[in-house]
Amino acid sequence: MDFSPPHGLRGGRSPSLQDTTISSSHTQKNGGDSTPLPPINERLAFLRPSRELLEYYRKKIAEFDEEHEDLVKRLEQYKATYEEQHKLQWEMRQREEEIAELQKALSDMQVYLFQEREHVLRLYSENDRLKIRELEDRKKIQKLLALVGTSEGDITYFHKEPPSKVTIPQRTVQSGDPFDRKVQRSGRAGVKQVPLKAPGKQDRTKAAEKEDPQILLLQVEALQAQLEEQTRLSKEQIETLLEDRKVRMEEAQVQHQRDQDKMKAMTDKLNKTQKLLYESTRDFLQLKFECRANEKSWMAEKDRLLRELDRCREQLAFSIDPEQEREHEREHEREILRLSLAEKATRSSHSEEVKSLTEQLAQAHRLSEMYREQCVTLEDELGRIREEGDVGREIFKERSDKVAKRLQLMTQRYEALEKRRNMEVEGYKTDIKLLRQRLKDVEKQLFKVTLNIGPDQDLAILDAVRQGNKKTQKIQGELRNLKAKIYGLENELRIG
């Protein structure tokens, strides 16, 4: 900042080198005897500034005011821009956190959805099992009815409860030869045997041949449907996990690239700040060196001028009368005041420049410390992000291993179910064969019993029929309970 006016704008006459030397020497020699210096306003009153000088300083002050206002406006604009950038960065960070939370919630919802679908599949399998069991129970009832057989006096109820007591019609006692009654009973037994044996046997064999394969086919279809549903569910789970893995890898890659760009930008800023700090420090040291050199040159010039002033005073001591000497001293005092004011102005300007440079250096140090702290925080954040990425990779690897193990376990379970189904089919076939053999044996025994039936065996047959009715009643009660359970499960499935 140059406050010195150009040549020709200074007020009053310019002092010569000889006058300056004489006035400085006189001031130093008579410093102890003369009165103290007048105040600054009184000393400024001796100056005679011109209009050009005042106009020059007004222009300088106006330029400095405009420059100051421009710098303040720029500083405010920079502050507003930095605050807006910080606000946008903060909002972007919040949005990223919200996106991460939403993605986590979406993953949890997918897991819950798959769990609910597995639960629904289990309910479907339970429903199929109960329906197949209902068919088996019906088949058993029909077999039992076929084994027991029906007579003209017996009534079988399927929808209502059977009577608690079995009523048997009484036969009238016939007179005559007992041999004739025996033949008649055997004849009636033969009449009963012919319609009961052949059609009952054929119906039972046909029902066994028709119903058993039907139940097995239903079981096979239910197992196939369950296997298809489980396979489709497993495929969807694997596809969802792969898609989630792909999304997470893309997000990690984008975040890594963003961190790399941010690190690069911060490194460039740090290098620029270090360069600016170096240049500011170098300029400050250069200005300090120049200021000290100027001070040394001023001191040397002042010593030289003082010596010359002493020599000139000694020469003029005898040639000037006292009045002229006093007038000359007053004139030199005025010149000394002018020189001291100019010297103070230059010193104040230099001190202001040194002060501004010192403030700039301190500001540069603060900026360098701030950028260094930012770099340290960014490095810590980068390390944390890398650690989080490594942890995420490990978690994803563990999840992938768990999914692979689960898939292998499900495959083993499916194979075990297939083996079990095959073994159950073989067991059903063997059971069917055994039941057919037992039916044949029972039919043979019934045939023998009907042939050898006597008068005392009617009550035994009635007891067997009564027991069969009781068993039928018990089985019907169990069937009603099973139907109630099945209807309850179907209602729960509809409501769910």
From Swiss-Prot:
InterPro entries: CCDC77 (IPR037696)
Positions in coiled-coil regions: 51-113, 214-495
Disulfide bonds: none
Sequence ranges of Polar residues compositional bias: 15-33
Keyword Signal on entry: no
Domain of life where this protein originates: Eukaryota
GO cellular component: centrosome
Region annotation (Disordered) ranges: 1-42, 170-208
Keywords (A to Z) from UniProt: Coiled coil
Gene name per UniProt: ccdc77
Name of the protein: Coiled-coil domain-containing protein 77
